[in-house]
Regions:
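N-terminal presequence-like segments and the immediate start of the first folded domain
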Residues: 1-79, 85-134
Length: 134
């Protein structure tokens, strides 16, 4: 966790100091990752909005790997994952890429997959995770 402190905020709330690390997004008003008290909260997406769910899933997972590393975590420490798909008929294709990436059974988090309007016609997937810091 030594590389985590670069974005550290110390917030005093009712006499208690909270150490919160925020990894700001390119988008205004949000972070790609936040860590606090040994937990990391990360959102991943394909910044390039590649064609097809397999490409967007792979790019989102590369993005997730990078953001997890920024907050001192990794896929082996995932606790909970929610995958949002713009079209649930793409779930089987997404699962192929996910299963290849996640690796052995010891890495498997609790996971849900939900159909959602992702706000535009090009974004096919967003992945939201909670992970332990390692």
């Amino acid at each position: 966790m030594s590389g985590v402190a670069k974005n550290l905020e110390r917030i005093n709330l009712k006499g208690c100091t909270l150490n919160i690390n925020r990894v700001h997004s390119r988008a205004r008003g949000r972070c790609d990752a936040v860590s606090f008290n040994g937990l990391a909260f990360v959102v991943a997406y394909d910044p390039d909005a590649a064609d097809g769910i397999k490409s967007q899933t792979l790019n989102s997972l590369f993005f997730l790997d990078a953001k997890l590393a920024e907050v001192g975590s990794g896929k082996e420490a995932l606790l909970q994952t929610t995958v949002y798909l713009s079209d649930m008929t793409m779930k089987a294709e997404m699962d192929e890429v996910w299963c290849e990436w996640i690796g052995p059974r010891d890495n498997w988090p609790q996971r849900a997959c939900v159909g959602a309007d992702l706000g535009d016609d090009v974004t096919l997937i967003e992945i939201v995770v909670i992970a332990a810091q390692i």
